[in-house]
Swiss-Prot record:
Classification lineage: Eukaryota, Metazoa, Chordata, Craniata, Vertebrata
Organism: Bos taurus (Bovine)
InterPro entries: Peptidase_S1_PA, Peptidase_S1_PA_chymotrypsin, Trypsin_dom
Name of the protein this chain belongs to: Probable inactive serine protease 58
Pfam families in alphabetical order: Trypsin
First-listed, main subcellular location of the protein, grouped into a coarse class: secreted
Annotated gene: PRSS58
One of the record's GO cellular component terms: secretory granule
Glycosylation sites: N157
């Protein structure tokens, strides 16, 4: 793939990219349910052939389900696309002993059909600023049956906080420049069951992928997110070379 084609795919017309003014009661069109024989994860569509998620979501027998609101009742969904994948590519510096560089790209077997229910999200050209409002979206288990797929898609609007504020929530963690924190300090830290690797989309731009949280991000507890803008060269090079 040459650089001109790569640029074109990463800058698709607005009609095919995510509109941040979507309705709160539907699934954000960039959100993907990563279903496996183990625990599920959240993925984000950044290209008709590529999905980004956390590197710890290296899941067995993975299926990628787009356009779904209730994974526990997928037979009643009208706009679902189910695709397989060709390869998973971890960030080369990722280690299972660290929350840093926790990103993975998934190449799909076929190009996704983009429509009103399935769209790509834009990648950042500048970092999210402190106090920017972000939409964090993932699925939750209202019925507390972890042997089934989650039954509730939820979105929460929360703000980017400073490293100083983040350290009030995570006193013993090293918050690096490649990370950002989103949430409310001190937060409630109530236990809940939600699907991991939730994205933080700020002003319509994908700014972060959840790498660690002690609590429940859907209740606005502080989460630590991989800062996407730091990895744009790796993302672009990976897509170009694969």
């Amino acid at each position: 793939m040459n650089l001109i084609l790569l640029w074109a795919l990463l800058n698709l017309p607005v009609a095919l990219t995510f509109d941040p003014n979507y309705k709160d009661d539907i699934t954000p069109p960039y959100l993907i349910y990563l279903k496996s024989d183990y625990l599920p994860c959240v993925g984000v569509l950044i290209h008709p052939l590529w999905v980004i998620t956390a590197a710890n979501c290296n899941l067995p027998r993975l299926q990628l389900i787009l356009g779904v609101t209730k994974p526990s009742n997928i037979d009643e969904e009208k706009y679902v696309q189910v695709v397989g994948y060709e390869k998973m590519i971890h960030h080369p510096q990722f280690s299972i002993t660290s929350i840093e560089h926790n990103l993975m790209l998934i190449k799909l077997q076929t190009h996704i059909e983009l429509n009103n229910y399935v769209k790509i999200v834009s990648l950042p050209k500048e970092p999210a600023a402190e106090d920017d409002t972000c939409i964090v979206s993932t699925w939750a288990y209202n019925l507390c049956d972890h042997y089934k797929d989650p039954d509730s898609l939820q979105n929460v609007n929360i703000s980017v906080i400073s490293k100083v504020e983040c350290l009030k929530a995570y006193k013993y963690m090293h918050i690096r420049d490649s990370m950002m924190c989103v949430g409310i300090v001190p937060g409630r830290r109530q236990p809940c069951k939600e699907v991991t690797a939730a994205p933080a989309v700020c002003n319509g731009i994908l700014q972060g992928i959840l790498t660690f949280a002690d609590g429940c991000v859907l209740r606005a507890d502080v989460g630590i997110y991989t800062r996407i803008i730091n990895y744009i060269p790796w993302i672009e090079n990976t897509i170009q070379n694969n």
